[in-house]
Amino acid sequence: QVGAVGFCWGGGMVNRLAAASDALKAGVCYYGRSPTAEEAAKIRARMMLHYAGNDARINEGVPAYEAALKAAGVRFQSYVYEGVEHAFNNDANAARYNAEAAALAWGRTIGFF
């Protein structure tokens, strides 16, 4: 079975891969761009979505994405980490990295798989 994890641009690619192929059985997207409603309707993989609370550009697409996943009957989990910035899991970026949120999100990701 195939699963994928992506961060930022890579998170958006996980969303697109899930829409493009039934081969993906599980996907985890960290603060990636949401697919269109048409793309989301094609997703069959289980999905886990992680978002930063302080990420208006990415988060503006989340409600429509989640509604499309629900309408398509996709099993998904979505988490918003309040008070953290986009790229909160990137420990090479001290201005954005949040160790507590990163550890929680990664633990959830490992548990998901």
Give the label of every model feature segment.
Residues 11-22:
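Short glycine-enriched nucleophile-adjacent loop
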Residues 1-7:
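Alpha/beta-hydrolase fold nucleophile elbow
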